[in-house]
């Protein structure tokens, strides 16, 4: 049996099925699209669900993929065993109503025995116990003897997911040899020992499970297969676990090299090495696909993995951030299959480095705190660390709960996870793995899923702004109706339309649908996965009936404004990459008629110079009046041209390419200008952060940009008028006024100091003594809070030992300050507690340290009373 590397195996599989008429699709993003049931893609078929359900039309009836997958339910076992991992690649060949068992089974056998040359005698199969059809194909067509075909029950060999498409499956097993088994004479497929390893699962989706639990046959059965690439590599390389597979082993070896720890020297260090190896593979792929560390959802999964890996690095003696270096090895090993890794390498490593540095700031302190709580828990004779402690470690020190659990288990303790979850709920910040149960299923129904799936709306909007059409459906109050009257809110589905439906960040068109005796004001347009355009609006006149001939007309002026912003968004994306670097990728966008919003990956606020450079570059391209060339082509042809694809977007065999000269080329389904000069110009109005590693630009074009400049110009004129100068001299006038103010403030401060100096002796002379402690109270209404604090410092220093209580009503606001020398703090004085009670009298609040505190209040007339209350509290503290 030929020893093949993981990368070669992947390519051999995909090429084999291409030879069988399959379209090779690139791996979909790990971020699910329109599937609230999943946090991250966890199987080869997950991103293909819409094709299996008929919600979307597949690019071809036969498809093959190698899909990146993440699974984290068993994260605590990763590292402890050599089998568990969070990242894996799933090979698959799929048929959407095309071929079935007669082809799928022999092809699987052909790939194994002829392409990979796996010895026939090492292969076994299992089938569903009632699937005689599969048995006949394996036995008669393939030639496998009956004793090597094992019938198994529903739990093992029948795939179903609640209600919906389901069916039997057949699994192919590799016999690792008797020496890996249990030694029992009846050992075969299904035995719990390590001899037989399941390599390939062929799912025959031929039934539909109904609500009542019955099964009906699907008109067009499907094929869904899945084979773990790493597991296949274990077989072909004759190794015992995924960490010994060639590409993964090279990552592991690099970790050993930089830590100076030999793999296999101890089980404890082996666990840490395996944790880092697995987690860096997962995190590198997640960041490449646009996941950013956060405290919720998939961002929290990423943070957990990175921080767990960082902690295990410390256990190996790493005292510096190192994970981004290891990520470079992952990128090197996988960039052939996933070229985007190389393109985004800088971005990936920067995300990892920043997150590791953040954790580095708190982990040591957190470990000290956790050690203290572990010791306290043991002293109490308890076995569980409280949920409050787990929450404190999570919120203050950035410890994911599974990291706290892992450390607790190493010390023979458990954690109160239920208590932790309750605390998280209180703070509305629960990041959960059971996202699926909270968000519902991607297989769920709505009114539109019950409509005829073969009915689609023909989109004419790329070339037409109005069109005649026929009403196919009218939906009112979530019900399909035959007609609707004036005043009704409706959704209208037409057989053809010029209305663009919201997608790709571009908002839907507005306009009118008119017929004889009826008019609908369209306020928005969306579309279903199966291609129906939903014209959402209100009937302004008459009665709209199903089957009516209508005229659909978009708001052309609004559409043009949207096109300005959409084309400019493409220019902006390219300019950002030119100015900031190739790590910049689109993380989201909103294209409206009056503005554009663009989110992108970058790790610091842009400087004013960078913003100006981007803006200038976009305006330069607008002024060049570059033709916007839009055409359809194959996805392969588009990639060869260098077209930029967006994170997580699904693309079919044929794609729409928007090319702006030699400057920008992107895959895009939106509406655009004919030439860039139609945009007028761009004005960036804001740049801000929206998440860790994600920045946002908001900008205006065309009329909106002109309006913005008009408003700015008016503001400048108004300022100049107030300053009694010309607009061009406003800055000089403001600088002059600021200098005058600064000089005046300096003079005031000098006068204030003289005033304080002259009155200090009087203030100190009025000091009272309480239980041997000097207490000074005074009121300075001419001082603001800053001056009051400075005066308090001066009096405390002159006093030498004692308490100072000052108040002011400057500007109509109450300000109070309490200061104490260290020796009286030792006697029981606490400035924070004193001021808290004093401020209540004046209708305010505050607090602070034992030696210094300040507060505010609302009632200036109560200042003297507040000072007296402070003295009472001091008496109480000294008496206690």
From Swiss-Prot:
SMART domains (alphabetical): tRNA_SAD (SM00863)
A GO BP annotation: alanyl-tRNA aminoacylation
Keyword line: Aminoacyl-tRNA synthetase, ATP-binding, Cytoplasm, Ligase, Metal-binding, Nucleotide-binding, Protein biosynthesis, RNA-binding, tRNA-binding, Zinc
InterPro entries named among the record's database cross-references: aa-tRNA-synth_II/BPL/LPL, Ala-tRNA-lgiase_IIc, Ala-tRNA-ligase_IIc_anticod-bd, Ala-tRNA-synth_IIc_core, Ala-tRNA-synth_IIc_N, Ala-tRNA_ligase, Ala_tRNA_ligase_euk/bac, DHHA1_dom
Parts forming coiled coils: none
MF terms (GO), sorted A to Z: alanine-tRNA ligase activity; aminoacyl-tRNA deacylase activity; ATP binding; catalytic activity, acting on a protein; transferase activity; tRNA binding; zinc ion binding
Domain of life: Bacteria
Cofactor needs: Zn(2+)
Catalytically driven reaction(s): tRNA(Ala) + L-alanine + ATP = L-alanyl-tRNA(Ala) + AMP + diphosphate
UniProt subcellular location: Cytoplasm
Cellular component, GO annotation: cytosol
UniProt-listed Enzyme Commission number(s): 6.1.1.7
PROSITE patterns named among the record's database cross-references: AA_TRNA_LIGASE_II_ALA (PS50860)
Cofactor note: Binds 1 zinc ion per subunit.
Binding-site positions, Zn(2+): 566, 570, 668, 672
Pfam families tied to this protein: DHHA1, tRNA-synt_2c, tRNA_SAD
PANTHER family registered for this protein in UniProt: ALANINE--TRNA LIGASE, CYTOPLASMIC (PTHR11777:SF9), ALANYL-TRNA SYNTHETASE (PTHR11777)
Matching NCBIfam families: alaS
Record-stated family: Belongs to the class-II aminoacyl-tRNA synthetase family.
Written domain comment of the UniProt record: Consists of three domains; the N-terminal catalytic domain, the editing domain and the C-terminal C-Ala domain. The editing domain removes incorrectly charged amino acids, while the C-Ala domain, along with tRNA(Ala), serves as a bridge to cooperatively bring together the editing and aminoacylation centers thus stimulating deacylation of misacylated tRNAs.
Function: Catalyzes the attachment of alanine to tRNA(Ala) in a two-step reaction: alanine is first activated by ATP to form Ala-AMP and then transferred to the acceptor end of tRNA(Ala). Also edits incorrectly charged Ser-tRNA(Ala) and Gly-tRNA(Ala) via its editing domain.
Annotated protein name in UniProt: Alanine--tRNA ligase
Species name: Acetivibrio thermocellus (strain ATCC 27405 / DSM 1237 / JCM 9322 / NBRC 103400 / NCIMB 10682 / NRRL B-4536 / VPI 7372) (Clostridium thermocellum)
Organism phylogeny: Bacteria, Bacillati, Bacillota, Clostridia, Eubacteriales
């Amino acid at each position: 049996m030929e020893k093949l590397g993981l990368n070669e195996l992947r390519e051999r599989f995909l090429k084999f099925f291409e030879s069988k008429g399959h379209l090779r699709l690139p791996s979909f993003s790990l971020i699910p699209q329109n599937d609230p049931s999943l946090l991250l893609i966890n199987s080869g078929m997950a991103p293909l669900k819409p094709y299996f359900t008929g919600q979307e039309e597949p690019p071809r009836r036969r498809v093959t993929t190698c899909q990146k997958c993440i699974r984290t339910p068993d994260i605590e076992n990763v590292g402890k065993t050599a089998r568990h991992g969070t990242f894996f690649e799933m090979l698959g060949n799929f048929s959407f109503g095309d071929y079935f068992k007669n082809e799928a089974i022999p092809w699987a056998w052909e790939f194994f025995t002829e392409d990979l040359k796996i010895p026939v005698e090492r292969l076994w199969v299992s089938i569903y116990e009632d699937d005689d059809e599969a048995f006949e194909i394996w036995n008669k067509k393939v030639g496998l003897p009956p004793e090597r075909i094992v019938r198994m029950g529903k739990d093992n060999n029948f795939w179903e997911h609640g209600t919906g498409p389901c069916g039997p499956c057949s699994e192919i097993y590799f016999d690792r040899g008797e020496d890996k088994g249990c030694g029992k004479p009846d050992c075969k497929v299904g035995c719990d020992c390590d001899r037989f390893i399941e390599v390939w699962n062929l799912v025959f989706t031929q039934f539909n499970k109904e609500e009542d639990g019955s099964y009906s046959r699907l008109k067009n059965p499907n094929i869904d297969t899945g084979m773990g690439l790493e597991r296949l590599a274990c077989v072909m390389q004759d190794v015992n676990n995924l960490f010994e597979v060639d590409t993964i082993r090279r990552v592991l070896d690099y970790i050993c090299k930089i830590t100076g720890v030999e793999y296999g020297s101890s089980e404890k260090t082996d666990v840490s090495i395996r944790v880092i190896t697995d987690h860096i593979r997962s995190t590198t792929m997640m960041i490449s696909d646009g996941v950013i560390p956060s405290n919720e959802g998939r961002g929290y999964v990423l943070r957990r993995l990175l921080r767990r890996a960082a902690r295990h690095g410390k256990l190996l003696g790493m005292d510096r951030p190192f994970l981004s270096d290891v990520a470079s090895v992952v990128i090197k090993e996988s960039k052939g299959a996933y070229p985007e890794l190389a393109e985004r390498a800088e971005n990936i490593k920067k995300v990892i480095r920043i997150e590791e540095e953040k954790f580095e700031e708190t982990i040591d302190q957190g470990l000290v705190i956790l050690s203290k709580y572990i010791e306290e828990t043991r002293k109490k004779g308890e076995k569980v660390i409280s949920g409050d402690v787990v929450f404190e470690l999570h919120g203050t020190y950035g410890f994911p709960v599974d990291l706290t659990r892992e450390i607790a288990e190493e010390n023979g303790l458990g954690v109160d996870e239920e208590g932790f979850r309750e605390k998280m709920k209180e703070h509305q910040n629960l990041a959960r793995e059971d996202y699926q149960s909270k968000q519902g299923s991607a297989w769920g129904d709505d009114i539109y899923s019950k409509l005829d799936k073969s009915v689609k709306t023909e989109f004419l909007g790329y070339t037409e702004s109005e069109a005649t059409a026929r009403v196919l459906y009218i939906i009112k109050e979530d019900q399909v109706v035959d007609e609707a009257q004036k005043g009704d809110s409706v959704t209208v589905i037409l057989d053809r339309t010029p209305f663009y439906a919201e997608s790709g960040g571009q908002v839907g068109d507005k306009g009118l649908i008119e017929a004889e005796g009826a008019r609908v004001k369209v306020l928005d347009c969306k579309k279903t996965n199966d291609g129906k355009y939903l014209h959402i609006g209100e009937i302004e006149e008459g009665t709209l009936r199903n089957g009516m001939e209508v005229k659909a007309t978009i708001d052309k002026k609004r559409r043009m404004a949207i096109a300005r912003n959409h084309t400019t968004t493409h220019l902006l994306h390219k300019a950002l990459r030119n100015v900031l670097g190739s790590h910049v990728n689109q993380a989201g966008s909103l294209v409206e008629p009056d503005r554009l919003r663009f989110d992108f990956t970058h790790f610091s606020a842009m400087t004013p110079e960078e913003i100006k450079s981007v803006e200038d570059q976009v305006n330069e391209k607008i002024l060049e009046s570059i033709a916007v060339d839009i055409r359809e082509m194959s996805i392969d042809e588009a990639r060869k041209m260098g077209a930029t694809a967006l994170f997580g977007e699904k693309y079919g065999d044929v794609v729409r390419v928007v090319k702006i000269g030699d400057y920008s080329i992107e895959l895009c389904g939106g509406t655009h200008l004919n030439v860039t000069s139609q945009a007028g110009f761009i004005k960036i109005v804001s740049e801000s952060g929206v998440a860790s590693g994600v920045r946002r630009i908001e900008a205006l074009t065309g009329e909106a940009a002109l309006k913005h400049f008009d408003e700015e110009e008016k503001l400048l004129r108004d300022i100049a008028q107030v300053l009694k100068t010309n607009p061009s001299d406003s800055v000089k006038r403001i600088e002059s006024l600021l200098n005058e103010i600064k000089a005046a403030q300096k003079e005031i401060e000098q006068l204030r100091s003289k005033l304080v100096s002259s009155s200090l002796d009087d203030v100190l002379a009025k000091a009272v003594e309480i239980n041997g402690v000097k207490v000074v109270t005074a009121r300075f209404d001419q001082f603001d809070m800053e001056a009051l604090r400075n005066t308090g410092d001066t009096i405390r220093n002159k006093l030498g030992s004692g308490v100072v209580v000052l108040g002011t009503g400057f500007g109509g606001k109450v300000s109070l300050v309490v200061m104490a020398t260290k020796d009286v703090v030792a006697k029981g004085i606490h400035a924070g507690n004193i001021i808290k009670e004093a401020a209540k009298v004046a209708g305010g609040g505050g607090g602070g340290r034992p030696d210094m505190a300040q507060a505010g209040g609302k009632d200036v007339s109560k200042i003297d009373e507040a000072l007296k209350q402070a003295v009472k509290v001091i008496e109480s503290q000294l008496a206690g």
